Amino acid sequence: MNHDSFSSLKFRRPSSKLHKDPPSIGSRMLKSQQSNTSLKRHPSAPVYPRSSASRSREHSRTRSNAYGSSTSSLDQNSGGPSPVLANNESGYFSGNHNTTKSRPPHSGRFSLNDQSSDELIGSPFDSRGMLSALQENTAESDRQPIQKPPTLRSQTTPDTRGLRQSASFTALHNRMDALVNRTDSDRSTNTKRYSDEGNGTKPVGRSKKASFSSFVNSMLGSPRGIKISAPENPVHVTHVGYDNQTGQFTGLPKEWQRLLQESGISKKEQEEHPQTMVDIMRFYEKNAQGDDEVWHKFDHAYAHHHPVTTSSSQPSSGGSTPYGTVGQRASSPTSPRFPQNHEGSFENPRAPPPIPRGAPAATQAMSPPVGGLVPNRAPPRPPAAANMTPARPAPQPPTTASYATTRPVQDPWPQFGTIPENAQPFGTPPIPESEPLPSGPQLSRSNSKANGATAPWVSPAVTPSPTQYQQQQEQAMATAQQAIASKQLDRSQSLRQQQAQQPKQKQATHPTPQQVSPVEDPSAALQQSARAVPAARPRQRARQSNAMDIRSRLVAICTPGDPTKMYYNLNKIGQGASGGVFTAYHNGTGSCVAIKQMNLDLQPKKDLIINEIIVMKDSKHKNIVNFLDSYLHGLDLWVVMEYMEGGSLTDVVTFNIMSEGQIAAVCRETLNGLQHLHSKGVIHRDIKSDNILLSLDGNIKLTDFGFCAQINDSHNKRNTMVGTPYWMAPEVVTRKEYGRKVDIWSLGIMAIEMIEGEPPYLTESPLRALYLIATNGTPTIKDEQSLTPVFRDFLHLALKVDPEKRASAHDLLKHPFMSFCAPLSHLAPLVKAARLSRAQEKAQKGGH
């Protein structure tokens, strides 16, 4: 059958008159087979009654008033009950083809006349043509205003008498069922049964798209909504505030509350300066995570009066070595106040005081001094004249027994010059060797065991009376890290055991400089392992460079070659957690040099090493320790520097009383070095007597550039809290932005150190010292009236709290106090006296 003849409802008749006889049965069967679709009548389509008596010779069209088009209507008996409605509610067969012409019997049209239904049974029908007609009729009916018919009622039952359905109609309605996609339940609740009954319904084309989309979604599944899981491994960050109404801190952890109670800061002081306390506690909060290297400084603040089992010939800690780059900051606090061997007199005897990081810690002097807690050596009297020369001989060091019994009571932070280097740690069997230490034996001037036990630096046969006082010292600085320390305990203990054997194996298998030097003590390895297992430091890990990147940068700045073939006669004079300090002689010139060996794997901040090397290379000045060379030898970094055999300024201020002329000379040389650094945009940030080295001739040079910071026009301020607490400027303590003037404040504190023998607040806990620096501002001098007015004015300008009003290095170099400067040769006797006093101290303690 030709499909084009059924593309619309208007067909051309081959003749104007048809015979009554219908097509033969065979013809109908043949055409029925051509219809490839079995159609079924829609279940809800109305059944129209027919009059069996109306028959005629022709197929004449019967116009129906119940439909909009006579071409799509079914003849019915209007007299009987019927669901046929006006305006063609069904909508399936609506159209605009209003014609009365008769049609061919085989045209496939589905309108019927009064002819008997028996004659049309099995009449063929083309579904594709019907679908095209439906789409056209639907589009036309959408453009015509249609009056909404009344709703069909369930009581309306059509009269089905005399009507037999054709198989074509049944197949057609099944096809339309799939296209319209309606259910009986939908039509029972919705009066708009078909697409042409309402303006809001979708055409058949859209229904096809909807059906296809539903099919695809059913096959592929609808996209799932985004699900956000709960946070994993959350970390609680402590937030500390201050309630102005109640005058109390809010959000303080128990450890901090106990720390404040034991630090000697009264509630009255806390209420008087709440913002200062918040700043200090935030400082603790930040650095408890190990973000700043200042904690290393705290760790070694008082290393000299805590014992660690070492051989009597073990040299002092590299942490007290002025040549120790990062090793000085992360050094082992195993050394006493002064080095063991005389050749190490250049060594930095007093390591910077850091706050513990997961190591056994105890803060010293947490409460006011108990009766008898007076330094053995009274502070030196300020000089009366500029040309005054030291007249007091070095004090005799106490014996081991007297030190063990009286020293803990007199001063938890011993005064310099009175502590024999072979005191309890070296002269008597120490206790802590057999005791388990949390996360490493980090015993230092500000440290003890984190569990709050009595500090193990007292002789086993003698126990100090103020044990409770000592316990307070131990707990003060450890509380912020107890949780972290407990987590690191197991791993750090195993690593300590492994690394304790490494120095012995290295000595047995490799001819390294350690063989030339005295035997290393196992405690140094323990200190190294403790440093190798630092506490959790999330922020620092984010900022640390990759290990390979660090090594590549070091390769770029280091000299290629084997340093063991360039230097000979290495003598170990110091030991730190990162390595040892040696003196050696150059093969070519025969000059004596200082070599700092650092194990890169043990460095907490490798960037500081690179920073220090770069600063020293670019800072050639007569008042800065001369950097000679650097080498990468295996896993160690060798830094070769000028050897200052006179030692540090700390030795001089400990064993001698300095005149104003000598103090002025030291200040002048230090200011010259600072001016050079500041002109290059470098801030030293750790000026103190420990980092001022002297030669035997009295020449003065700066050292330890690991904490240097670069500033420029775009970044001319810093806010990182680094340095040693007792020498820190107020703007650093309160975490404000700072610049070059922080070095000037530290110089003023160092001047007080040369007057009194120690910096202000040294007998206070580090936390209270920070509080006093922030609240008191300019410190007071014990006997200020004995100073000349010019010297007092010099100190006043250097110790201005407001950095804008504080003098610069250039200003102080022009100050009248500089005219008091004594020749540098006048410092040579002080250096020699300090060396002699140290040698006598060793002899009395059995040192060799």
Curated annotation (Swiss-Prot):
SUPFAM superfamilies hit by this protein: Protein kinase-like (PK-like)
Full protein name: Serine/threonine-protein kinase ste20
Subcellular location as annotated: Cytoplasm; Nucleus
Low complexity bias (residue ranges): 308-327, 468-515, 527-537
Source domain of life: Eukaryota
Gene Ontology CC: one annotated term: cytoplasm
E.C. number(s) listed in UniProt: 2.7.11.1
Keywords on record: ATP-binding, Cytoplasm, Kinase, Nucleotide-binding, Nucleus, Pheromone response, Serine/threonine-protein kinase, Transferase
Boundaries of every Protein kinase domain copy: 567-818
Top enzyme class: transferase
Keyword check for Nucleus: yes
Catalytic reactions of this protein: L-seryl-[protein] + ATP = O-phospho-L-seryl-[protein] + ADP + H(+); L-threonyl-[protein] + ATP = O-phospho-L-threonyl-[protein] + ADP + H(+)
Binding, ATP: I573, G574, Q575, G576, A577, S578, G579, G580, V581, K596
Active-site residues from the entry: D686
Record-stated family: Belongs to the protein kinase superfamily. STE Ser/Thr protein kinase family. STE20 subfamily.
Lineage: Eukaryota, Fungi, Dikarya, Ascomycota, Pezizomycotina
Pfam families xref list: PBD, Pkinase
Xref: PROSITE patterns: CRIB, PROTEIN_KINASE_ATP, PROTEIN_KINASE_DOM, PROTEIN_KINASE_ST
Biased composition (Basic and acidic residues): 183-196
Biased composition range(s): Polar residues: 65-102, 152-171, 328-338, 441-451
UniProt-annotated stretches for the region Disordered: 1-208, 306-547
